[in-house]
Amino acid sequence: MKKRIALVTGGFSGEAVISYKSAITIDKNLDREKFDVYKIDINPNGWFYELADGAKTEIDKNDFSLLVNGKKINFDAVFIGMHGTPGEDGKLQGYFDTLKIPYTSCDAATSALTFNKRFTVAVAAFSGISVANSVVLIKNAFQSPDEVAGKLKFPVFVKPNNGGSSIGMSKVNKMSDEFGSAIEKAFREGSSPK
């Protein structure tokens, strides 16, 4: 009997665009002789499975199941193909742990830690791992790019603290207006609606 796999994609951040692309690749490479794959889109509007006719059916979050043609579908495992929150920050992992549904990726605690760059750097440094010099900026306490420029050697990479590694990331080669724009971009992308 084939295993039922939920391929989770989407997300609540700008990284959803990347998640959808990843899901296409994952979907193409899962062995259909072994697995029945259901692509589940999690986005700010809800959690859905799209039927062949284009109609969407909502996921029952009480047990992460869905109804297809009156038949309840429960999943044997989840393939997390989501970038950003809630797929990389431990939220989905914790949810699936609660439901005792196995999933790909690391556990909830590891996901939560590694999604936060500041915490990850602190734990790595405490463990004796060499880390690059970095400065964490707090949005409401941040005054200007000049206050941090002297603490860093250019070029620098500016990234959201609680985001992925692609959306909101900028490489800045020298102190300029570009540095301030990169910081603002990171602040925008680092905030998630849910």
Where are the predicted features?
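ATP-binding N-terminal substructure of ATP-dependent carboxylate-amine bond-forming enzymes
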Residues: 1-109, 113-115, 119, 138-146
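Active-site nucleotide/adenylate-binding loops and adjacent lid/helix of ATP-dependent enzymes
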Residues: 5-9, 13, 21, 113-194
